[in-house]
Every structure is written in structure tokens, then in C-alpha cells.
Amino acid sequence: MSVSRRVIHHGLYFAVLGPLIGVLFLVLYIFFAKEPLILLVIIQVLPLFILLSITTGAIPAMLTGVMVACLPEKIGSQKRYRCLVGGIGGVVITEIYCAVIVHIKDMASSALFENILSGENLVVRIIPALLAGVVMSRIITHLPGLDISCPETDSLS
């Protein structure tokens, strides 16, 4: 598989599945760390919650996928290092993206965006980005569309 095809597949899969994995872990975090009754409120607004996570997390997730696709073969061929780089890259890219959005006041005009992007809710951004980066880096070679018989993707699994 060519590098450009791998970049496109990784970027799209990360952009589509990454925010959803982040939402799953965030809901579990809220359920176990806060009161379980708050989960009922989240379930009521789950479609808005998912939409918000996709609008704020798709671009950083796509950039993380592109970064993972461009890893050198020595790092990308080992699952442990690929997951480590994917997790750290997810956090760093998400924080840079959120910092850019905060400085562009037009995009962060709503109170909901300002609340999520503020420094007080760092855990709400870091934990989902870290876990989504790790999980997606782990499962990316098993998703459809990637030619598993190709030596370039065999070295990544």
C-alpha cells in the first residue's frame, strides 16, 4: 500500500472513529468519577454530546491518524511504540487545536465551547484524546480497506 493511501485511510478512520471512542471513555469516566445520576442527563443529550465531540475532535483525530500513518517503519512496526506515539500525539494535537480555537474567538463564541476549551476541563480533553489515540493506533491495521497482505501494513500489525 502506498504511503498516500495509508495516510488517507488512517486519517479518515481516526476522524470517524476517534471522537466516538473518546465519547465512550468520557461517558465511562463521568459514570465512575462523578455521580451515576449525571449519566442520565448525559444520555438525554447524547446526540448533542456526540455531535459536539465530532465537531471538536474530528480534526485533531484526523491529524493524529496522518501522524501515525507517517511513522517510520521501525516505530510503526511495533504495536507498543505505535500506541504510545498515537496516544501522545493525540493529546498534543488536541491541545494545540484547542489553543488555536480559543484564540479564534469567532469559533468559541458559545458558552458550551468556551466551557469545554477552558483550562479547567483539561481532563475532559486529555483522557479521551489519549485513549482514542492509543485504541485507534492499536486497531488501525485491522480495519477494512487496508491491504493486510501488503508488506508495508504487515510490518505495522
Curated annotation (Swiss-Prot):
Entry GO CC:
plasma membrane
UniProt keyword annotations, A-Z: Cell inner membrane, Cell membrane, Membrane, Transmembrane, Transmembrane helix
Q: Which family does it belong to?
A: Belongs to the CbrB family.
TM regions (residue ranges): 12-32, 37-57, 84-104, 126-146
Q: Where in the cell is it found?
A: Cell inner membrane
Side Periplasmic, residues: 33-36, 105-125
Lineage, please?
Bacteria, Pseudomonadati, Pseudomonadota, Gammaproteobacteria, Enterobacterales
Q: Note whether Cell inner membrane occurs among the keywords.
A: yes
According to UniProt, the name of this protein is Inner membrane protein CbrB
Ranges facing Cytoplasmic side:
1-11, 58-83, 147-157
* NCBIfam families linked: PRK09823.1
- Which species expresses this protein natively? Escherichia coli O6:H1 (strain CFT073 / ATCC 700928 / UPEC)
The way this protein sits in the membrane is described as: Multi-pass membrane protein
- Top-level division of the source organism's lineage: Bacteria
